[in-house]
Amino acid sequence: MPKGRRGSQNPKMSQRPAPPLYFPSLYDRGISSSPLSDFNIWKKLFVPLKAGGTPAAGVAGVAGVRSLPLAPPATVPPPPPGLGPPSERPCPPPWPSGLASIPYEPLRFFYSPPPGPEMATSALVPGSTTPWLASASHPEELCELEIRIKELELLTITGDGFDSQRYKFLKALKDEKLQGLKMSRQPGKSASCS
């Protein structure tokens, strides 16, 4: 009997508990003294079969899977699509060209063109350059100005430096753009009302 242990050895205390039946995580290594490869979840879920139809040695015992008598398979079923050797994997079909024929123009969805018959017809034709596209840059420019103004305000808050002349210039430019946008919309509304 080795030193440091008191009393007689109990056979129940010397045995380790059986591995858990749930999926082990990386932190459950203390339960068993087996190597890390025994904790591979995929080895426990999918027990590889030998050519004779019996589970591979060691894997079934570690996984706690009982080996049932299996009839020798007549033919091995093919792997699911996308699995198997790279030479046997089918290439995915190319993207159908008919699905992406609509041009991607997110601003057309969020920004309605000014009213007018020539604008309505030309806005539906893809690739046409109209004054509407020039007016669509106003919201983009306003957004860019707002972003620059917010950046300057953040620099003021963090104390990294503040350029008051640039801030005043950007504010004046933003106000000028807003006034120009309002003026371009007001004549269209007054003409449609009269």
Curated annotation (Swiss-Prot):
Region annotation Disordered: where it falls in the sequence: 1-21, 73-97
Q: Where is the composition biased (Pro residues)?
A: 73-96
Q: Name the source's superkingdom.
A: Eukaryota
Q: What InterPro entries is this protein classified in?
A: C11orf91-like
Positions of disulphide bridges: none
Pfam families (UniProt xref): DUF5529
PANTHER family named in the record: SIMILAR TO RIKEN CDNA A930018P22
| Protein name per the record | Uncharacterized protein C11orf91 homolog
| Protein's organism | Mus musculus (Mouse)
